[in-house]
UniProtKB/Swiss-Prot annotation:
Its main location: membrane. GO terms for molecular function: heme binding; iron ion binding; protopanaxadiol 6-hydroxylase activity. It comes from Panax ginseng. The gene is CYP716A53v2. Activated by N,N'-dicyclohexylcarbodiimide (DCCD) thus leading to increased ginsenosides accumulation. Its EC number is 1.14.14.121. This is Protopanaxadiol 6-hydroxylase. The chain crosses the membrane at residues 3-23.
Amino acid sequence: MDLFISSQLLLLLVFCLFLFWNFKPSSQNKLPPGKTGWPIIGETLEFISCGQKGNPEKFVTQRMNKYSPDVFTTSLAGEKMVVFCGASGNKFIFSNENKLVVSWWPPAISKILTATIPSVEKSKALRSLIVEFLKPEALHKFISVMDRTTRQHFEDKWNGSTEVKAFAMSESLTFELACWLLFSINDPVQVQKLSHLFEKVKAGLLSLPLNFPGTAFNRGIKAANLIRKELSVVIKQRRSDKLQTRKDLLSHVMLSNGEGEKFFSEMDIADVVLNLLIASHDTTSSAMGSVVYFLADHPHIYAKVLTEQMEIAKSKGAEELLSWEDIKRMKYSRNVINEAMRLVPPSQGGFKVVTSKFSYANFIIPKGWKIFWSVYSTHKDPKYFKNPEEFDPSRFEGDGPMPFTFIPFGGGPRMCPGSEFARLEVLIFMHHLVTNFKWEKVFPNEKIIYTPFPFPENGLPIRLSPCTL
């Protein structure tokens, strides 16, 4: 009897071991570690709070240290989300665009920014046209317009002033440039009208997605529709005047319009222009503001930029505009822009959605889950950037940072097509700024907060004095 019981217990033990080894949760079947926080809200409030306190990287770095340096789970914007970290994570996500992941935006943002849902073929065709219009080798055609507009901006709004709010100035300039280069509007009244609507759109994008009359979200939707209406009028005028050719994005898209799936309606085109208006405005104005911010803190770097820009200025006639050759000479200034965007990235990251289940770092990433890649998993990591809190443009000399560590505009097939366009705007802005002024911050320790775009909490007021070199 005892032998029978013992044999039964032995068989039971063997069976349990069999189940344990064959059906235990494998690391390959585990979700990435982390927490999803409160229902619906998730960890969104904590994410926002870190940005508003001027420390957006805290949300990412704390969780990397607590859960995994490669990938962790959270919940943002009402979605279960996996955050990919480090250069390897960035490389994986950017290299698998249209294979395992595709670009995605929270529904609240899409509600404001898109009036139509274009087909896959139409989306690809539209993006191809944008990339072609903004490709680096085509940038030379924008220089004269950018330079002329920027020069006039400084004459109208900076000259004769002893103090300005630099961030508001950068926003004003980038909006003027965007209106002209995207759809050739430069009438001050019309630009001001669009700017007023644009501010409502931005406020709506940053608000709770409550679509009731009187809410910022509702006002944002209405303002976006009014901008589309204004653009539709321009599109109709442009179509009726077929002999008129302009070198703006609107004409580029309209002249390339195809048939069937590649035919773009007025709303398709208006959506594209609205999206580019927002993307070009926030990234560029942020970079301009950051350059002003850091050059005020580092006189020796300002002096190097001034020397470089003065050499170019002295080689020009009084009314002669900048050329492509001049832009290519602005090497140190370009490094300054890159370092400013490393410390204060124009965007905190981007979203993707998983189209096919896959494993990464021994964790499973389910189909349908959302992914967030963050600039902060690399931009301030001492593993990639020595003394990461220091402002040091020399990091970008020679070969510069290792691949997939400096990603202010993303990477891969969905990398922001306007990255070089934005740098060009900032370089021309820097040229006119440093050759005319030196400055100091009114609030020396002014903090940069994120809402979610970077913004100096006091608007970056600066005291101006004439350049003396």
